[in-house]
Amino acid sequence: MDEILKQYMVLYKKMSNMINGPDYPGKEKDIQHQKDQIEVYEKQLQQGFSTDYDYDVFADSVIKCAYGDMTLEDLEAVYYGLTTPFF
């Protein structure tokens, strides 16, 4: 599995759980820190998509994966399907 994709998904799930979890002092700061970390991976992943539409399809799949509606392996298949050039 692509390590960038794996780390991105781990951080995304962690942030999603944090957002939906109980409130605590410093939660907003922790969420912002997670967003900053995710953004680094997101920029690297975005470079592989040839269109904004393809990236949007991928982003929708990330959300599905974070909520358990799609496996990480399925997400990886979507990612490679959208980023692999056709010859």
Swiss-Prot record:
Domain of life: Bacteria
Keyword Phosphoprotein: yes
Database matches in InterPro entries: YnfE-like
Modified residues (Phosphotyrosine): Y12
Entry keywords, A to Z: Phosphoprotein
Protein name in UniProt: Uncharacterized protein YnfE
Organism per entry: Bacillus subtilis (strain 168)
Gene: ynfE
